[in-house]
Regions:
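Elongated, amphipathic alpha-helical interaction scaffolds
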Residues: 1-189
């Protein structure tokens, strides 16, 4: 490469075997779905067979670099298999779960990649115009009835009614390992 570029190499820096990340790359959550099952729950309707989910904490904003990092993870997940095209691109989705509407990121995606946003229902937005289906879930905008648990996974539950209601609903399921994990996450955010 350097020889081919000749005189222009003085303007370039070459870094062979460049490490892409200082820490191991990991996906927040990978949701695998059986191919023939169409998910009916509103947050999972977009799901295909392999679904990459990125969570942002209530304190964090979703920015353009987060978008590209997760998009790259989806591409690496698709490509890093034993056989070529083992994971078809058509079977991938990306879900971003956050607490603040990422207006700046979405404006940049529209400007640079012509990706548009379609509001599917309260708190659920599809990012249209890319080969990989993507959705954006804004937790505080979700329906409090349809998405009770996700909506209450935050650090600003109001004392009294909200907390009492959460504890009552949790109490009915406290023996479930999933609900115990949810309570642990809730404690970590308080």
């Amino acid at each position: 490469m350097q020889i081919e570029l000749g005189e222009e190499t003085k303007y370039l820096e070459f870094d062979s075997e460049h490490l892409l990340s200082k820490k191991p790359m990991q996906i927040d959550v990978l949701v695998k779905n059986e191919r023939h099952v169409k998910i009916q729950k509103n947050i999972g309707r977009i799901f295909r067979q392999y679904n990459i989910v990125e969570y942002k904490s209530p304190e964090d904003d979703l920015n353009i670099d987060d978008f590209y990092k997760v998009y790259a993870y989806a591409c690496i997940y698709k490509a890093d298999t034993e056989t070529v095209d083992f994971i078809p691109a058509a079977e991938l989705t990306i879900t971003f779960v956050c607490y603040h509407y990422p207006r700046t990121m979405l404006q940049k995606l529209h400007r640079d990649r012509q990706i548009t946003v379609e509001n599917m229902e309260s708190g659920i937005y599809y990012l249209m115009g890319d080969a990989i289906p993507m959705q954006l879930i804004i937790v505080p905008r979700l329906s409090k009835t349809n998405n009770y648990w996700l909506n209450n996974l935050r650090n600003d539950l109001k004392s009294g009614g909200e907390i009492r209601n959460f504890i009552e609903k949790y109490g009915k399921n406290k023996n479930s390992k999933l609900y115990q994990a949810l309570a642990e996450i809730g404690r970590a955010h308080v």
